[in-house]
Each structure stands twice: as C-alpha cells, then as structure tokens.
Swiss-Prot record:
GO cellular component, one term: chloroplast
Subcellular location: Plastid, Chloroplast
Name by which UniProt lists this protein: Small ribosomal subunit protein uS7c
A molecular function (GO) term: structural constituent of ribosome
Keywords assigned by UniProt, alphabetized: Chloroplast, Plastid, Ribonucleoprotein, Ribosomal protein, RNA-binding, rRNA-binding
Function in brief: One of the primary rRNA binding proteins, it binds directly to 16S rRNA where it nucleates assembly of the head domain of the 30S subunit.
InterPro entries: Ribosomal_uS7, Ribosomal_uS7_bac/org-type, Ribosomal_uS7_CS, Ribosomal_uS7_dom, Ribosomal_uS7_dom_sf
Major location category of this protein: plastid
Subunit-level organization: Part of the 30S ribosomal subunit.
Taxonomic source organism: Bowenia serrulata
Gene3D superfamilies per the UniProt record, alphabetical: Ribosomal protein S7 domain
C-alpha cells in the first residue's frame, strides 16, 4: 500500500459568460492545440444557434442533452483465466458526464462535412435533448452491451 495520500479532486471552474461548470468542461474537451479562445467561440456560437432555433434557454438545452447522453453502466474488459470478459460496471456521475461530453463531441465531429463545428455541435445537442442522435445511440449501445453481459457482473 502506498503511504502517499490521494490527491483531492479539483472542481471544474466555471466559464465567464454562463458561469457554469458544464460549459467549461465542454470547452476543455473542444479545445485543440491549446486554442482555448477558439473553443469558447465555437461553443458560444453553438449556444447562440440553439437559442435561435429552439427559443429556449441554451443552458437548459445543454443540461438536458448531457443528462440524456450520460450512461449509468458501461462494460470493462476483464481477463479471467485466459479469456477476456466484458464486465458491466456502474459509472459515477462525474465519469458519466465526462463520457457524455466526449460522445456528444465525437458525434458532432462525425456529422457530415460542409458546416462549421459550432453548427454541428448545436444540432447534435438539440438532437440529444430530443432523445435522438448519434450520442444517444452510443449510450443505448453501452447499456445494451452491459445488459447482454450481465452474467459476468460477478467478475467485478
């Protein structure tokens, strides 16, 4: 056993405009090559697009989308006696939120080319808030995998 104490988790800081941690987590995942101002610009344009299309508070649409994509369980590969089993494990809320953000951004990046990232992200978030879209499909796939491998839950 290590004698070193575990490091305390840092709470995510909130962004300057919406004063929301979730927005900042999203910006940090959009971020590429250290261009944070570009990441902020992409997200704020996406939020403005959501505001125009839905005429709702974009922050509530974002929260609803992330809540819809957040998985409860996932599978983890576990090697037991020479064979690998997909073992279902429960996910903590912070980890689930991080997965939801990653899946939403991945789904929006995979949308057909021709439009900018802000446009793709806004449409992916609006779809996720309406319970459809590729990110929601990914969550359902993870839940299906966990359900199919429920017999191996005791390998946890």
């Amino acid at each position: 056993m290590s004698r070193r104490s575990t490091a305390e988790k840092e709470t995510a800081k909130s962004d300057p405009i919406y004063r929301n941690r979730l927005v900042n987590m999203l910006v940090n995942r959009i971020l590429r090559h250290g261009k944070k101002s570009l990441a902020y610009r992409i997200l704020y344009r996406a939020m403005k697009n959501i505001q125009q299309k839905t005429e709702k508070n974009p922050l509530s649409v974002l929260r609803q989308a992330i809540r819809g994509v957040t998985p409860n369980v996932t599978v983890k590969a576990r090697r037991v006696g020479g064979s690998t089993y997909q073992v279902p494990i429960e996910i903590r809320s912070t980890q689930g939120k991080a997965l939801a953000i990653r899946w939403s951004l991945g789904a929006s990046r995979k949308r057909p080319p021709g439009r900018n990232m802000a446009f793709k992200l806004s449409y992916e978030l609006m779809d996720a808030a309406r319970e459809n879209g590729n990110a929601i499909r990914k969550k359902e796939e993870a839940h299906r995998m966990a359900e199919a491998n429920r017999a191996f839950a005791h390998f946890r």
